[in-house]
Amino acid sequence: MGQLIDSSVHSSLVFEVNGKVVTDSLVIAKIFKKNHFDVLKEVRKQIVYVGEEFGGENFHESTYFNSKNRRIPKYDLTEEAFTLLVMGYTTREAVGMKIKFMKEFKRMKQYIQNQQNVPKDP
C-alpha cells in the first residue's frame, strides 16, 4: 500500500501514500462487495471521463502481489476520486459505507495536518 502512519491512526479504509490520503481499488471492492476486476473497469472508465488533469491528480495506478505471487494492477484513489467512483453506489449499505469512508478521510487528513504542525526538536 503506502507508508502507514502509526498503528493507532491507521485505518483499514484510508491511508497515506506520498503525503496524500487515499484508499485503493482493493479496499473499495472488499467493502462494497464488488469484484475487483469490475472496480478496475469502473475506475478506468472514470479516468477517461474526467480527463488527464483530474485523473492524473486523483487516480494513481499501482500493483500488488496476489496469493499466487502474481503482480496485479490496482489504483490508489484520493477522496475526490473515491467520491466520484462510488457516487452511483446507492444501496442502504453502500450509503453507510460512504459515510464511514468520508469520516476516515477527514480523520486521516486532520492527523497529517497535526503532524505537520508539531514542532521538531532542535
Task: Name these PLM-found stretches.
Residues 1-120:
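An anion-engaging/catalytic patch
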